C-alpha cells in the first residue's frame, strides 16, 4: 500500500464519523483532499452536510466536486472538523500548516465540537519537530519578528534554521495576506512552552502547533486504518 492509498484509507474511516446534516469543517492538504473526494461521492448520493472550508484551495475543490459550503460567519459553531496533520504525537499534539492554512485551520478547529485528524503512519512521531514548524507572521517587521523567534527558541534550548517560505521565485502568502516562517528545530520536547513563547511575540499571527484540539486521530498504515485517542 503506497502513501496515497494510506491517506484514502484514513479518509474513509474518518468519513464514517460524519453524520447526515452535520455542520462540517473541512481541512486543507493532500489527505484532506482525499476526504473531500469521498465526501463528494456521498453528497452526490443525497448525503447532506454544510461544509466550512479552511482555505481557498479547499473551497475550490469542494465547489468543483459539489460539496455545499458556507462561511464560518454563517455557521459559527460546527459539529465536527476533519483535517490532516504534518506531524502528530501520541498526545495528539500536532504540527500543521504545511499547506499554508494554519490560521484558518486553527480558527475552524476551535469552533468545532470535535476534531478528527487524518494521516498516514509516516506522520506519527514520538517527538514533534522533524517537520519544520510553520509560523505565520505579519509582513511588517518580518526580520525583527524572526530575530525575536530565534531568541525565544534559544531560551527553550531550541536552534535551527528559520526561513521565509517561498512559492517559486516569490514569497508564499497565506489566504489572509501574511507570510510564513518555517522553523526547523529538529525536535520540540515542550510544545506548550514553545506555543506560549511564540504567542508572546507581537509579529507572530499564529503558529502551527495544535495543542489539545484533536479529539482523535485516524492513522493509516500498510495494514489499514486505526483510531488513536490522545494519551493523557
UniProtKB/Swiss-Prot annotation:
Q: Which residues bind substrate?
A: 28-31, 83-86, 96-99, 123
Summary of subunit composition and partner proteins: Homodimer.
Query: HAMAP family given for it?
Result: Rib_5P_isom_A
Highest taxon in the source lineage? Bacteria
Pathway assigned in UniProt: Carbohydrate degradation; pentose phosphate pathway; D-ribose 5-phosphate from D-ribulose 5-phosphate (non-oxidative stage): step 1/1
Q: Which organism is it from?
A: Allorhizobium ampelinum (strain ATCC BAA-846 / DSM 112012 / S4) (Agrobacterium vitis (strain S4))
Q: GO molecular function terms here? A: ribose-5-phosphate isomerase activity
InterPro entries membership: NagB/RpiA_transferase-like, Ribose-5P_isomerase, Ribose5P_isomerase_typA_subgr, Ribose5P_isomerase_type_A
- Gene name, Swiss-Prot/TrEMBL: rpiA
Q: Name one Pfam family in it.
A: Rib_5-P_isom_A
Q: Which family does the record assign?
A: Belongs to the ribose 5-phosphate isomerase family.
In its UniProt entry, what is this protein called?
Ribose-5-phosphate isomerase A
Taxonomic lineage is: Bacteria, Pseudomonadati, Pseudomonadota, Alphaproteobacteria, Hyphomicrobiales
Listed SUPFAM superfamilies: D-ribose-5-phosphate isomerase (RpiA), lid domain, NagB/RpiA/CoA transferase-like
Q: What does this protein do?
A: Catalyzes the reversible conversion of ribose-5-phosphate to ribulose 5-phosphate.
Q: What is the catalytic activity of this protein?
A: aldehydo-D-ribose 5-phosphate = D-ribulose 5-phosphate
Annotated active site: 105 (proton acceptor)
| GO aspect biological process, one term | pentose-phosphate shunt, non-oxidative branch
**Keywords attached to this entry:** Isomerase
What Gene3D superfamilies would the database entry show?
3.30.70.260, 3.40.50.1360
